[in-house]
Design a protein with these regions (language model features):
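P-loop NTPase motor domains
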Residues: 84, 91-109, 117, 121, ...
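Hydrophobic positions on the alpha1 helix immediately C-terminal to the Walker A/P-loop
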Residues: 485
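Conserved P-loop NTPase
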Residues: 763-814
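Extended, folded cores of ATP/NTP-driven motor/assembly subunits in large transport
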Residues: 1-438
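Conserved lysine of the Walker
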Residues: 482
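Hydrophobic anchor at the beta1->P-loop junction of P-loop NTPases
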Residues: 474
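Post-Walker A helix-loop "phosphate-sensing" segment adjacent to the P-loop in P-loop NTPases
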Residues: 492-502
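A short helix-turn-beta junction within AAA+ P-loop NTPase domains corresponding to the substrate/partner-engaging
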Residues: 518-522, 735-748
């Protein structure tokens, strides 16, 4: 794909990259410039001041938009694509993924050559570790931060996050100019990305810098220095793009080569069997070495392909006739053919039928394997491992003697090919190198730890705030680890963010953790001295934001509260709802007009008094409030007397009776609304955790109010999380069912049989995937983050201060 003379003269610096000209403004720091300068000095020293290493890299020009001019008339683009959950999908879904992947391969006609590159590359461990390290702060929690950082680092290094299996699809065309090539390549790129998107695979175009970065890591194994590059710096220093990506040195031997401080080799691979297992590529990439599988593909015109196959069939038929003649002359039965000829005829006839009637095309392909090692001995051991893997999959590996330079550069994602050995293969044959196993979820920057990917062993790390709907559900049977998972997320967020955290705790489970974090524990009970006022509003939000919305929300809440208090089969009448709304409007109008302060906040008794003044229509509601105003349950007829400014607040409602517990949980939710309202002005996130969430979903009024939170919280900077063992309660009404639709984060631990069926239907989870929440151990299950679904395992170290703060197991607390 594209040609050049070996050892061609190095291209002029000004033509090696096309840059949008302007005032140079380097993006590299002084320290990075020092590192780059040292690297260039090393390259000059290793090569005697000549550019021999740069000349090995076979392209003429890299454009900022990602178009690469490989040779005078050949241009290419590279798309990086990501993983899909192939391994844990059911057979039908695997077939769908396979079929759609075939569609992507069939996008390319005989004018477009393409290259599939699957490469294990090292990620900087120091950089990775830095992402999970929590900086110390001037507070009392640095010992916990240190312990948590050490735990995360340990889990990170035990996994394979230090390596990334990158997947590139490079395609190229012949063209007389960059402008004409770009237009066609960008059109092809759009079709390719759309093709991947059709089966849920993310794909993105690599721009010029990203392509250079991919080349840098392919050519610099085991180097700790990161890729450093800047277009303006290149112009200022009079450098070439190849100066930024080439290895310090290259020395080619008969069957291997030395590259910088490492050793490498490229081998060819021939397929012996008619069919291959779909895990062949997975077997190679799971070897945890710096390893690359490369497939160059040259599509045939469909008419030429049919002619080619028919000619092959004619030749084999002639072989058959010749064999029959020999058998007849020797006195044998002419119908008895050698098995190889019989099988060959069957294969060609099947291929001809597939080309005529199925979604199959024919291609010339060449397959190569590239590996790096730190020593020759290690490289030899690696080659033996590769041979065994090839044999296991009915393939044979062979060396490219005296062609290591040509084959090395052919493994780079450029669309350039000097690999001599090639064979014919149809669409399904190429697609059987299935590049999909399991999706990964590891976000850089501020993110929360959620366990280890059961399939890959990699850490799961994500930031819910980045989701369109950060609302979440944590679901599981008793003993599955719900409370522990919630506390782990709370602890992580407390240590790594500035978010406010509020917990509704119906079972009194969160006290040890909240106390250790110096949080505010609010005990709501008939005999408690701590009070929260259900008539509270956020005064600043009213005065400076949206007063009508504040009062409308408060009215909606108080109507729901009165409906629970009044009870009965039919709840409040339309007239009663209207009169409550009227009274609420009047109460807060008077409050606002008379220098509003916290110590003048209205009480439930004010609402009762206003209702009495409305006469007969409001009498039933006013009388129902009596017990909560002057009776035994008047704990909510007091002004708030607790510090609500603490960053972490836990409402302990364990001692409330069942009916009062619903009232308490609803009042807590309204208090959270007030906090979210106040924080919205500060652009601060408020996380709200509701344990025993099913208690709120059983009553129409509290269920409706909860559904409203799930619909509106995100706009105000709220992140609610419902925790429950009763999944069926989430289907109690269409309104409540919408909670599922408005939750882009679902953390599923072990599930009861009936709940598994509900989750499978609502979240479109396959039977194969549901195995991970069937009789699973504590801390094991499935996580859904937007469209990503992964099995996870969280074996939290028990010999830590953190574990003792979070566990609820009686054996651990004894």
């Amino acid at each position: 794909m594209g040609f050049r003379k070996r050892n061609a003269k190095r291209s002029d610096n000004r033509s090696s990259a096309k840059v949008i000209m302007g005032k140079p403004a380097s993006q590299l720091s002084k320290e990075e410039k020092k590192i780059l300068s040292a690297r260039m000095a090393e390259i000059r020293s290793e090569n005697g001041g000549k550019n021999t290493v740069q000349n090995t890299i076979p392209f003429l020009c890299m454009y900022q938009d990602g178009v690469c001019q490989v040779s005078e008339n050949f241009f290419s683009l590279t798309v990086q694509f990501y993983d899909a959950n192939y391994s844990i999908s059911e057979f039908d879904e695997q077939n769908n993924i396979f079929s759609k992947y075939c569609d992507v391969i069939n996008l390319f006609d005989n004018t477009i050559k393409f290259q599939l590159t699957f490469e294990n590359q090292n990620r900087s461990k120091a950089k990775l570790v830095k992402t999970v390290q929590i900086p110390e702060q001037d507070d009392d929690f640095n010992s916990i931060r240190k312990e948590y950082s050490e735990m995360l680092t340990d889990k990170l290094l035990k996994g394979s996050n230090g390596q990334s299996a990158r997947k590139f699809l490079t395609f190229g065309i012949e063209s007389t100019s960059y402008k004409a090539a770009r237009a066609k390549l960008m059109s092809i790129k759009n079709d390719v990305i759309k093709g991947f998107k059709a089966f849920g695979v993310e794909a993105e175009l690599l721009d010029g810098r990203q392509r250079l970065e991919a080349l840098y890591y392919a050519l610099n194994p085991y180097r700790n220095s990161p890729f450093l590059f800047d277009w303006d710096e290149m112009l200022r220093a009079g450098m070439d793009t190849k100066d930024f990506i080439c290895p310090p040195s290259l020395k080619f031997n008969k069957a291997d080569f030395e590259i910088g401080n490492a050793y490498g080799a490229v081998w060819g691979m021939n397929i012996l069997a008619g069919e291959l297992p779909d895990e062949i590529l997975k077997d190679f990439l799971e070897m945890q070495n710096l390893f690359c599988v490369n497939i160059h593909v040259d599509p045939l015109d469909q008419i030429d392909a049919l002619k080619f196959v028919k000619k092959k069939l004619t030749n084999v038929e002639q072989m058959k006739i010749d064999e029959q003649k020999k058998a007849s002359q020797s006195g044998y039965d002419p119908d008895i053919l050698p098995p190889a000829i019989k099988m060959y005829i069957e294969d060609i006839e099947k291929l001809l039928g597939d080309l005529n009637s199925k979604n199959e095309r024919l291609f010339h392909i060449s397959i190569s394997l590239r590996a790096y090692a730190k020593s020759k001995k290690e490289l030899k051991l690696l080659s033996e491992m590769l041979k065994r893997t090839c044999q296991k999959n009915n393939c044979i590996m062979f060396p490219y003697d005296y062609r290591q330079e040509q084959t090395l550069v052919s493994t780079l994602p450029l669309g350039y090919n000097e690999i001599p050995v090639r064979r014919e293969m149809h669409t399904s044959g190429i697609a059987i190198f299935v590049p999909f196993t399991t999706k990964e979820l590891f976000q850089d920057g501020q993110a929360t730890y959620y366990g280890i990917n059961t399939l890959s062993g990699n850490m799961i790390r994500a930031n819910r705030s980045r989701l369109k709907n950060p609302n979440g559900l944590i679901l599981g049977t008793p003993g599955a680890g719900k409370s522990f998972s919630v506390k782990r997320e709370i602890l992580d967020c407390f240590l790594t963010t500035v978010d406010d955290i509020i917990i509704c705790d119906p079972e009194g489970e969160y006290f040890p953790l909240v106390s250790a974090l110096h949080g505010q524990l609010i005990r709501i009970a008939s005999n408690s001295e701590q009070h929260i006022n259900p008539m509270d509003i956020a005064i600043d939000d009213y005065m400076f934001s949206n007063p009508m919305e504040v009062i409308a929300n408060k009215s909606d809440f108080l109507i729901s509260l009165c409906e629970i208090i009044v009870g009965g089969r039919y709840g409040l009448s339309a007239e009663e709802r209207s009169v409550i709304d009227k009274c609420v409007q009047r109460i807060y109008k008077h409050f606002i007009e008379n220098e509003p302060t916290e110590d003048k906040m209205p009480l439930l008794s004010d609402l009762q008094r206003e209702l009495h003044e409305e006469g007969e229509v409001a009498l039933r509601v006013a009388n129902s409030l009596e017990m909560f105003v002057n009776g035994s349950q008047n704990l909510f007829n007091h002004r708030t007397n607790i510090d609500m400014s603490n960053r972490i607040i836990c409402f302990d409602i364990k001692e409330l009776g069942n009916q009062l517990k619903k009232v308490g949980m609803l009042i807590v939710q309204d208090t959270v609304w007030n906090r979210v309202s106040a924080n919205r002005e500060k652009k601060k996130i408020t996380r709200y955790y509701i344990d025993e969430f099913h208690l709120l979903l059983k009553e129409e009024q509290t269920a409706k109010y909860s559904a409203e939170i799930w619909k509106r919280f995100r706009k105000w900077g709220g992140v609610p999380t419902g925790i429950t063992q009763n999944v069926k309660d989430l289907l109690s009404s269409q309104e409540v069912e919408n909670i599922f639709d408005n939750s882009d984060f679902v953390y599923m631990l072990n599930q009861a049989a009936g709940d598994r069926d509900i989750l499978a239907e609502k979240l479109h989870i396959s039977k194969e995937q549901m195995k991970y929440v069937t009789n699973s151990g504590p801390g094991e299950g499935l996580i859904r983050y937007d469209k990503v679904l992964l099995p996870f395992t969280d074996k939290f170290p028990q010999d830590t201060q953190m574990y003792r703060l979070m566990t609820t197991r009686p054996a651990d607390l004894a």
